[in-house]
């Protein structure tokens, strides 16, 4: 069965209450299909473009409507950029609901901007993203101390500021770390 723009190939159901895929309590949309095949990838089961299952976007939106106590939505996989039309539609929907949007991709921001010259859907998708975690996972650069990413080459890009300033602007991790420290301190007081 061939995929249409009204359905997305997902690796699994939406995963709520994630605390490792961006700040706050998040729901992860696990897309299926990835051509990067990074050595040491934590999700190799999501590489197969015919794996997972096709889900109508309407059903994914209904699942998003039922979410409770979530501060953000993270697109991961697989690589969401291999399903840009579907992910753009869902990101737009999530943004209207007030969610903070993070996207993990093996493409670099610069590659996505090049791809946007041939198909503007990539730029359209970027416009709904708050933070892009870009670049492939590189096993030789693995670093377990990094916030929300696995290897030194990957960046946390503040997409709205990057698009506005027309240069890469990194997400200010210190703001998150200070907020997190304050939350933990209040828990113990």
Roles of regions detected by a PLM:
Residues 83-95, 102, 142-189:
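P-loop/Walker A phosphate-binding loop and immediately adjacent motor/lid segment at beta-alpha junctions
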């Amino acid at each position: 069965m061939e995929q249409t723009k009204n359905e997305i190939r997902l690796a699994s159901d939406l995963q709520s209450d994630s605390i490792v895929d961006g700040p706050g309590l998040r729901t992860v949309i696990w897309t299926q299909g990835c051509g990067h095949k990074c050595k040491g990838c934590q999700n190799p089961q999501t590489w197969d473009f015919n794996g997972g299952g096709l889900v109508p976007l309407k059903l994914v939106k209904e699942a998003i409507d039922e979410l409770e106590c979530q501060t953000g939505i993270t697109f991961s996989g697989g690589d969401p950029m291999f399903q840009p039309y579907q992910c753009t539609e869902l990101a737009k929907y999530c943004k209207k609901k007030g969610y903070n949007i993070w996207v993990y991709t093996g493409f670099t921001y610069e590659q996505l901007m090049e791809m946007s010259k041939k198909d503007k859907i990539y730029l359209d998708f970027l416009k709904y993203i708050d933070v892009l975690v870009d670049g492939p996972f590189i096993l030789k650069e693995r670093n377990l101390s990094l916030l929300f990413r696995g290897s030194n080459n990957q960046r946390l890009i503040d997409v709205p500021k990057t698009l506005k300033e027309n240069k890469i602007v990194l997400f200010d991790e210190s703001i998150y770390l200070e907020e997190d420290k304050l939350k933990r301190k209040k828990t113990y007081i």
